[in-house]
């Protein structure tokens, strides 16, 4: 959509909000995190539907927590959401010089070794609140193509697509499988996540924190068709910056068993979540689709 069409009065309130957020992203780093935590507190109070979803998810995934512990984790999660929003916008808008000292990459040699095979790399990730800034740190070292879900709001989609195209080299709608395969054929690193519940004929149910979760098998299928290596990729917020984690390429993947592959990927995500549970995107209805005979948990 042309930018001129996004300047009409219907978008003015959103433009105002974007202007405020632009200002917050240019605060010193510590102030920015503090502002993000406050945004999270406000969101916790106002977004009661998402708060309820996150609370249910935490109850399902961490049954050993008592009510007080779970509510404390829930509040920390919303703080992480607020910080994640400003981190995402910082990743879109700020120059490398403002960010590069904050990112510490662990395992870059695994990505380089996988790219040296010449058949492309699937950077398998998940929806953690520091996802965008983690990808930004990685783009300082290599070109990335990122699969994403287009936003329904045209103005947000404009900024999302424009920013990701400029920082990540190329943003690809998650349903554009042929375009993803072309990227892999060019030996590019393609970021892809399978941890959100979207109805899809290629989803299977696989264990996630002891519960069956509908899991997209696209990573397995892309790897099978292209011969690409699959390198797990996660980002964790620390006290003084961020740790970007690149693990060794998965052996014997895909295995030929989509359900077993989905379980393996879910276990990788679960292990990372347990390191910093507040930093995962709990406001998503991860357990929305249920196996036949099970009731809706939400």
Predicted features by range, described:
Residues 13, 47, 127, 153, ...:
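Charged, low-complexity surface patches
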Residues 3-8, 39, 43-46, 65, ...:
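Non-catalytic C-terminal accessory region of glycerolipid acyltransferases
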């Amino acid at each position: 959509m042309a930018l001129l069409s996004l300047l009409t009065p219907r978008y003015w309130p959103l433009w105002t909000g974007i202007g405020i957020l632009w200002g917050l992203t240019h605060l010193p780093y510590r102030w920015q995190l503090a502002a993000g935590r406050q945004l999270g507190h406000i969101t916790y109070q106002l977004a009661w539907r998402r708060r309820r979803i996150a609370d249910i998810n935490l109850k399902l995934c961490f049954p050993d927590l008592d009510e007080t512990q779970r509510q404390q984790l829930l509040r920390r999660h919303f703080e992480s959401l607020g910080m994640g929003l400003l981190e995402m916008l910082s990743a879109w808008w700020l120059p490398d010089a403002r960010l590069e000292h904050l990112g510490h990459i662990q395992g870059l040699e695994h990505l380089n070794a996988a790219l040296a095979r010449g058949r492309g790399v699937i950077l398998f990730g998940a929806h953690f609140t520091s996802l965008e800034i983690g990808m930004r740190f990685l783009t300082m070292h290599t070109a990335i193509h990122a699969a994403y879900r287009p936003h329904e709001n045209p103005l947000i989609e404009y900024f999302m697509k424009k920013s990701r195209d400029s920082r990540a080299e190329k943003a690809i709608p998650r349903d554009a499988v042929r375009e993803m395969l072309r990227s892999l054929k060019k030996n590019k690193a393609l970021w892809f996540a399978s941890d959100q519940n979207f109805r899809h004929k290629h989803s299977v149910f696989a264990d996630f924190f002891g519960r069956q979760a509908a899991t997209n098998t696209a990573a397995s299928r892309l790897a099978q068709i292209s011969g690409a290596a699959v390198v797990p990729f996660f980002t964790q917020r620390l006290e003084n910056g961020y740790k970007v984690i690149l693990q060794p390429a998965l052996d014997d993947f895909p295995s030929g068993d989509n359900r077993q592959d989905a379980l393996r990927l879910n276990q990788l995500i679960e292990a990372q979540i347990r390191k910093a549970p507040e930093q995962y995107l709990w406001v998503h209805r991860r357990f929305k689709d249920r196996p036949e005979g099970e009731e809706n948990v939400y």
